[in-house]
Amino acid sequence: MLTTRDIETDEDFAQLAALPGIAGVGAVNRILLPMKLRSAQELREAAAQLRGDIVLLYTLDTQFHTESKLVAPLKAVTLGVFASEKSRIVTTCAAAFIDVRTGFVYGVAEGTATEARRSSPWKTEAAIDAARLKTEREAFSGALKEIAKAWTSINAEYNRTTAALR
């Protein structure tokens, strides 16, 4: 589900569409989703409305750390307190290929990125947000490489199986 496209590019979607065995790639938008999304089942139902067979579900988990502790929720004021400490932003993008009809998980992929520096450059919320977006983009790019590998394996296994049934 893309409610806001912060890190995804048209090139990313073109890369996914070019994978073997992919007939088309589309994003599920908010119109197809309930007001309060509660489960992967609801995402699968939305993908089914678009006649999708497999949904690539991914999530971004971003955490902010200083040398002494995990900081959340992150604000410029919070990092300003730790100006002499080294801070890290760590983002992991986890993805799963899920059968729209059955919920079967065909495979998973993951990418992680880290940005580390002294806290003092992250004094404004805009600077913190820019660093967050950078790590999220890098994690997503890393996950895309793993997604391509996983999909190639999934496609090879299941296309062989369905071809044998014909």
Regions found by a protein language model. Give the residues of each.
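Stable alpha-helical elements in mature extracytoplasmic
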Residues: 8-12, 39-43, 139, 143, ...
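Solvent-exposed loop/turn segments at secondary-structure junctions
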Residues: 32-34, 61-66, 114-118
